[in-house]
Amino acid sequence: MADSTFLAPELSDTESMGEETVRFQELLLKASKELQQAQTARPDSTQIQPKPGFCVKTNSSEGKVFINICHSPSIPPPADVTEDELLQMLEEDQAGFRIPMSLGEPHAELDAKGQGCTAYDVAVNSNFYLRMQNSDFLRELVVTIAREGLEDKYGLQLNPEWRMLKYRSFLGSISQQNIRSQQRPRIQELGTLDASGSLGTCHGPERPHLNLWLEAPDLLLAEVDLPKLDGAQGLALEIGENRLVIGGPQQLYHLDATVPLRINSEASRAAFHRRRKQLMVSMPLLTASS
């Protein structure tokens, strides 16, 4: 990842940019206003009733904890990647794969022995749940992500060891949950700009299609289409505080995009999706006080 001081040419000088580049910047700045409004506005929500799936038991310093893994078609599915592709991402500590899930509030329950315990309901997409039923790998991954999500959200410290209940699909009663009913607006599909006026020439590197969207108020995601590549070998990625630079092997691709948001380059991660031939970039955003 590049330091922002390394990526600091004077892109603000419109006299040094071509007409297409200026249009490129104007589209981004216009979309930035929509994003800022989305960050400050309270998102619309809808109420869902998750369906039971399976229940796992673990514990914290305060006693037994049960996690009801539930599902709902209203939860968006994760990206369609194979287990081999996902395993490669995890082995390389990449953050190109996310499992959308809804983390419910804690509710007090009684276990099989009549002793007090705490239960949490965690909902994932119904179609993804069906896929997870046939995969021990996905099941363990979902439980791990759910446990870590509950720890972050509620300040818990849960035992990473857990076991799945054999004869109960949930503990207690599964409550309704509120989820965002609208996706946040995409910034801009930058690849829709006229390719004939792209930053390169017909004999130079191709500028790939770039898609950006705000996944959460503090997380910007990018997808870069690289159909001529079979993997990440030779691919160069540099991320500054407000800039994304990508270079391909044999000078096949070059992208130099200014983003009207402040990126935490140190925490950014990327993964190459072999089947879709896309580079997926996860970029946490800096707060105003950073």
Curated annotation (Swiss-Prot):
GO CC annotation: cytoplasm; nucleolus; nucleus; pre-snoRNP complex; R2TP complex; RPAP3/R2TP/prefoldin-like complex
Tree of life domain: Eukaryota
Alphabetic keyword roster: Nucleus, Phosphoprotein, Transcription, Transcription regulation
Classification via Pfam families: PIH1, PIH1_CS
Gene Ontology biological process: box C/D snoRNP assembly; chromatin remodeling; epithelial cell differentiation; positive regulation of glucose mediated signaling pathway; positive regulation of TORC1 signaling; positive regulation of transcription of nucleolar large rRNA by RNA polymerase I; snoRNA localization; TORC1 complex assembly
Record-linked InterPro entries: PIH1/Kintoun_subfamily, PIH1_N, PIH1D1/2/3_CS-like
Modification type Phosphoserine: residues: 12, 16, 173
GO molecular function: ATPase binding; histone binding; histone reader activity; phosphoprotein binding; protein kinase binding
Family label: Belongs to the PIH1 family.
Protein name per Swiss-Prot or TrEMBL: PIH1 domain-containing protein 1
Annotated gene: Pih1d1
